[in-house]
Structure formats: structure tokens, C-alpha cells
């Protein structure tokens, strides 16, 4: 600070308007994201309760994957509109054009890569941590989309082989 009470960058040491606006935008984005996940999770639970018992396995799985992909695309669009996230896909489109079974193994520190990959590639059968099937927000979409729990391991391997053979 200099003698006039301002710092060397020209500010007064207080909170700038930009910081306040950024904080408000992040608060709105956080609340919107939370609401989106909770409402979406509940809708997927309802969809799972309705579709899984009444639609054949492949039909309900295809519907679940389509709905989940749309939900993730919409979520990423929401975050982009709010100005908190921008996703660039490089090389991922090549995977969409491949034929036959394919293993995609993202290494996600915060589930973002799973959201981005599912939003971009159709018909994925994901292997997920079995405990996530106890999460009321995630269980509906994961079950409806035919995701494969990672435990027990021998069943995970069997289901994964079946999914690869189906393409």
C-alpha cells in the first residue's frame, strides 16, 4: 500500500466488483448444479421404476443411455452458459466412429471425464464403483443405462465381456 491507501495495482485493497460478480456467478452455478443433479436423479429413479420392469432389457438400457447422455449434455451446456466450464474434445469423436466393442478407460479425479465421455459417445456401458449404486441420485440413471458394478469382480468381468461382444 502507498500513502493514499491504495495498493500498487491501483486498487484500494477492498473486494473488487469483479470478485463479487464472480462469487455470485459461482454460487448460482453451484446451486443450479445441485438442483439439476437432485431433480435429474429423482427423475431417473422414477424412469427406472417405470421402464425396467416393463421394457425388455436392451430397450430399457438403450433408453436409459439415451436419457443419461441427454442429461449430461444438458448439464454441460448449463455450466457453459453460466460461464464456469468449457469442455474441449480432442480425439474423442474418433471413438464414436469405431465399430465393435471398445474399452474406454478414463482416469477421473472428480467424475468430470465420465460426464464428458458419456455426453459425447453413444451407447456406453460403464463400469462403476459398486457403492455408487447406493447413492439415491446416481442409482436410477446407472441402473437404467445398464452400468456394470465393479463388485463382485468375477461378475464385473463376465458382464464386461458380454457388453464387449454386443458391441
Q: Which positions does each model-derived feature cover?
A:
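Soluble catalytic domains of membrane acyltransferases
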Residues: 81-167
Amino acid at each position: 500500500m502507498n500513502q493514499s491507501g491504495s495498493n500498487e495495482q491501483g486498487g484500494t485493497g477492498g473486494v473488487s466488483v469483479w470478485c463479487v460478480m464472480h462469487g455470485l456467478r459461482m454460487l448460482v452455478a453451484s446451486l443450479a448444479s445441485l438442483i439439476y443433479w437432485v431433480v435429474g436423479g429423482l427423475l431417473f429413479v422414477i424412469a427406472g421404476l417405470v421402464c425396467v420392469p416393463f421394457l425388455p432389457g436392451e430397450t430399457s438400457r438403450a433408453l436409459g443411455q439415451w436419457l443419461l447422455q441427454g442429461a449430461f449434455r444438458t448439464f454441460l451446456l448449463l455450466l457453459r452458459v453460466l460461464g464456469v466450464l468449457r469442455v474441449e474434445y480432442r480425439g474423442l469423436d474418433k471413438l464414436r466412429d469405431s465399430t465393435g466393442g471398445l474399452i474406454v478407460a478414463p482416469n477421473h479425479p472428480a467424475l468430470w471425464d465420465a460426464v464428458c465421455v458419456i455426453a459425447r459417445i453413444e451407447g456406453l456401458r460403464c463400469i462403476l464403483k459398486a457403492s455408487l449404486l447406493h447413492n439415491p441420485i446416481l442409482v436410477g440413471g446407472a441402473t437404467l443405462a445398464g452400468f456394470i458394478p465393479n463388485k463382485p469382480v468375477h461378475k464385473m468381468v463376465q458382464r464386461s465381456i458380454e457388453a464387449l461382444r454386443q458391441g
